Amino acid sequence: MDALEEESFALSFSSASDAEFDAVVGCLEDIIMDDEFQLLQRNFMDKYYQEFEDTEENKLTYTPIFNEYISLVEKYIEEQLLERIPGFNMAAFTTTLQHHKDEVAGDIFDMLLTFTDFLAFKEMFLDYRAEKEGRGLDLSSGLVVTSLCKSSSTPASQNNLRH
């Protein structure tokens, strides 16, 4: 069986709902990577990141920010998906997502999780605040540069070629 036959054979076993799910995830990746979405999310986070503190206690002020985020970002994504996939249903997709969560790229799933999981939402803001305040992950102290060339103990001026 050649590669084309194998691919065709595999496709015949995937259901229409799987293909639809894959199409939505592909569109989601495009939307999330788009400059317009990145700007929308960055502006929202710039507006509120200083409200969030890395403590166990969750302030009452977090709730309206969370609700505003859901309204703004989820609405934007849903509108974009409706433009690209006529008849798209966010509620149905969310249900399907729970069954396919292991198949979705981590960054997409994490972003979608910020709509329903408050702790994921708060963590996103804490990470953003740490980055803005220069407290991001610093790997420089763990890096060591080693020359792959063996250095000679003889200075270059004394290293004459002799015939």
From Swiss-Prot:
The lineage of its organism: Eukaryota, Metazoa, Chordata, Craniata, Vertebrata. Belongs to the ARL2BP family. Widely expressed, with most abundant activity in brain, especially in hippocampus and cortex. Also expressed in lung, cerebellum, liver, kidney, retina, spleen, muscle and heart (at protein level). Its main location: cytoplasm. It is found in: Cytoplasm; Mitochondrion intermembrane space; Cytoplasm, Cytoskeleton, Microtubule organizing center, Centrosome; Nucleus. It comes from Mus musculus (Mouse). The keyword Cytoplasm applies. One of its GO terms (biological process) is maintenance of protein location in nucleus. Keywords: Cell projection, Cilium, Cytoplasm, Cytoskeleton, Mitochondrion, Nucleus. Interacts with GTP bound ARL2 and ARL3; the complex ARL2-ARL2BP as well as ARL2BP alone, binds to SLC25A4/ANT1. Interaction with ARL2 may be required for targeting to cilia basal body. Interacts with STAT3; interaction is enhanced with ARL2. Found in a complex with ARL2BP, ARL2 and SLC25A6. Found in a complex with ARL2, ARL2BP and SLC25A4. Interacts with STAT2, STAT3 and STAT4. Transmembrane segments: none annotated. One of its GO terms (molecular function) is GTPase regulator activity. It comes from the Eukaryota. Together with ARL2, plays a role in the nuclear translocation, retention and transcriptional activity of STAT3. May play a role as an effector of ARL2. This is ADP-ribosylation factor-like protein 2-binding protein. GO terms for cellular component: centrosome; ciliary basal body; cytosol; midbody; mitochondrial intermembrane space; nucleoplasm. Pfam families: ARL2_Bind_BART.
